[in-house]
Amino acid sequence: MQIYKLLSVLLEYPDQELIDHLPEIPEKLAQCADTDAAEEAALLQFIDYLASQPLTELQAIYVQTFDMTAENSLHLTHHLFGDDKNRGPALIDLGELYRDYGVEVVTNELPDYLPLILEFAAYLDDNEAMVFLSDAHKVLKVLSDNLREAESPYAGLLSIVEGRATLTRLAA
């Protein structure tokens, strides 16, 4: 599903390539048949935010938001286990799940990195993606709430991910 790939890209560390491709994103968003008006509005607002800031400022905000504030970590098992020994097996299980689906991870990030999780969700059909993400719903809600409380520009993106991790969407 293209929405998950788009969210994955937008939640990565901002670089010049992202800035260069910003004008293409609204067109790609228009091709996403599975987004609702609120999701589209949040995504377009975030794209406007990216376009309105210098790259160095975007990078500084990203680092401050996700790398310097543990409560906002994009490594989801960190929220569940911290540095507990149980985190390792959870990471291994997630990596094995990716391999079971034939997805080769070509990044230095751990398998629980949210942009990587969203990229994997893009390989799944709608219902599979919702079920997969629903396993992380509580963590996504905490992360979304933390970003909203901090008035982070990333709050809208996490709100979309949280909403898509709700099994009640299966009935729709």
Feature-to-residue mapping (PLM):
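Charged, alpha-helix-forming regions
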Residues: M1-D112, E119-A172
